[in-house]
Amino acid sequence: MKVIFLQDVKGKGKKGEVKEVPTGYAQNFLLKKNLAKEATTQAIGELKGKQKSEEKAQAEILAQAQELKTQLESETTRVQFIEKVGPDGRTFGSITAKKIAEELQKQYGIKIDKRHIDLDHTIRAIGKVEVPVKLHKQVSSQIKLDIKEA
């Protein structure tokens, strides 16, 4: 019996796959537990339509990430931080991913989730720094920071 998997089933198939499985297994397990549905021509047509719309949405998200990358990498986009500095040249407060995301939003209107900013450790020194940011699975960029003394 041909079925369309509605969820991942270990050892059998992934969500959205159309596969031939034993009839008893399909009727007694997959269909009853709503893990799959019978692969009729109508159901396969619906699946293809859903896959096309998902691909279109993914392409749109990728295009937005590419646009955001060009915005971030332009010469004019440099996030300014003015921090108090101690006698040893280190800032009193540290600059975190959350702070970078907030300043980017405030200064340029670019909204990025703080979890996408790949900051190994907090920044505590003054100067110019480039911080990597992951915008999409296929798109990554750099945020330029300019940390100055107050």
Swiss-Prot record:
Pfam family name, one: Ribosomal_L9_C
Coiled-coil regions listed: none
GO terms under biological process: translation
Superkingdom of this protein's organism: Bacteria
Keywords: Ribonucleoprotein, Ribosomal protein, RNA-binding, rRNA-binding
UniProt GO molecular function: rRNA binding; structural constituent of ribosome
SUPFAM superfamilies in the record: L9 N-domain-like, Ribosomal protein L9 C-domain
GO cellular component entries: ribonucleoprotein complex; ribosome
Similarity annotation: Belongs to the bacterial ribosomal protein bL9 family.
Function of the protein: Binds to the 23S rRNA.
Name the UniProt record assigns to this protein: Large ribosomal subunit protein bL9
Organism, as annotated: Streptococcus agalactiae serotype Ia (strain ATCC 27591 / A909 / CDC SS700)
